[in-house]
Design a protein with these regions (language model features):
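Non-catalytic nucleic-acid-binding/docking modules located in mid-to-C-terminal regions
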Residues: 35, 57, 78-80, 90-171
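Noncatalytic, basic helical substrate-engagement surface that gates or grips nucleic-acid strands
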Residues: 1-65, 69-93, 169-171
Length: 171
């Protein structure tokens, strides 16, 4: 949130009815012996990513289960990210190999793809008229978001190039 002030800016405040349940949820987790973590000013995905990396350093294999596709960027040789497809009945297991097979990109490129496409749920505007197909094509040609902008001058004139230039700060 410090890198991009508008990040998640359109998100509604957590309803009081839900917030009131937090103490009961914490108590239930304690009684079940399930560790839980929270830290002011940090979102759950930040904590999940940090704990996952710490577990990897201790030679643990990690499985993250979530409905948040943003967590796909955390997949690596020791981390599988299971994304729910239909409620909690069906999951899709993302590994670096599966991401490459499914989309043709790496976990690092997944982050860049999101920057190019934007994400309304996180209030990330992205580049005008860049969707998944075009974003992936650009990443395959240039390797990364940085690579796209390093080579922008050699791209032929087009509306896409114009949008990339005009929306650079949004990517």
């Amino acid at each position: 949130t410090e890198m991009y002030a508008e990040y998640k800016g359109g998100r509604a405040k957590t309803p009081d009815e839900f917030r009131e349940q937090f103490p009961f949820i914490r108590e239930m987790l304690d009684h079940l012996g399930i560790r839980h973590y929270e830290l002011a000013q940090y979102e759950a995905d930040d904590i999940i990513g940090t704990l996952g990396r710490l577990a990897e350093k201790d030679s643990f294999d990690v499985t993250i289960v979530s409905g948040d596709k943003d967590l796909i960027q955390l997949t690596d040789e020791h981390t599988v990210v299971e994304i729910s497809k239909k409620g909690v009945a069906e999951f899709e297991a993302f590994t670096p190999e599966y991401l490459m097979e499914k989309m043709g990109i790496t976990p690092a490129q997944f982050i860049d793809l999101k920057a190019l496409m934007g994400d309304k749920s996180d209030n990330i505007p992205g580049v005008t008229k860049i969707g998944e197909k075009t974003g992936i094509k650009l990443l395959l040609e240039h390797g990364s978001l940085e690579g796209i902008y390093e080579n922008i001058d050699s791209m032929k004139a087009s509306k896409m190039k114009e949008n990339l230039v005009n929306d650079k700060e949004q990517a």
